[in-house]
Amino acid sequence: LAATLYQKTNGGIQAVAVNTLGVLYVVEKGGDTVQSMADLKGRTILSTGKGTTPEYVLRYLLNANGIDPDKDVTIEYYSEATEVTAQMANTDNAIAVLPQPYVTAAGLQDDTLRVALNLTEEWDKVADTQLITGVTVVRKEYAEAHPDVVAAFLADYAKSVDAANTDLDGTAALCEEQGVVAKAAIAKKALPNCNIVCLTGDELKADASAYLQVLYDADPAAVGGALPGDDFYWTAE
């Protein structure tokens, strides 16, 4: 999405940090028929994120495992993860692609749900890049005018990420307080699987550019039709 926005704004935004690595899972209700990507062939898959990371990652992984996402499976897209979980509740033997923390929340509400596949692990089997789910962006005009503010933000951001990953109780309480999840208990259980990071500078460029190259090679539309230029990656002067 960030790469597409970069194209649509004629380079008007910059990525300042990778904030989330892989958080996508295949969840199965009431069975254990899905043990590998190959087991998805012929099935209906509920998913969020049409036109964003979940769609592109799922399609890439299906193709990499010899499954045509347009012919060999039926993918039903929903705008929100909560819609997917609601549909699963009303569908026997449902299969869905969900991100954390919704995987954890859904599992706590329905003990017949199980994590069938960790899509980060599936990605690692077929790609030589990190699976990236989210980046933090800034308007290029603002970053050029206020580089010190951006640098200060990133320093505070790194501290916040460290706290989120080490102080689970405090972070979980904040998640409930700010309405990120309904209950702190859900957040505390989900946080270790949320892959929250703060990758900046050379690490940001190396990981994000390699990931975008994989998406571009699979489908140029996934990154807005062209790979972003070097100016997409913000670095401190």
Residue positions per predicted region:
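A local structural motif
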Residues: 12, 63-79, 83, 90-93, ...
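Conserved C-terminal helix/tail region of periplasmic/extracytoplasmic solute-binding proteins
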Residues: 209-237
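Short, glycine-/small- and polar/acidic-enriched structural segments
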Residues: 1-70, 76, 97-100, 114-118
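Sec/Tat-exported extracytoplasmic proteins
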Residues: 6-9, 41-44, 49, 62-66, ...
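Extracytoplasmic/periplasmic, Sec-exported soluble proteins
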Residues: 18, 32, 37, 46-54, ...
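Pocket-lining segment of extracytoplasmic ligand-binding domains
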Residues: 1, 82-174
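Secondary-structure end/capping motifs
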Residues: 143-218
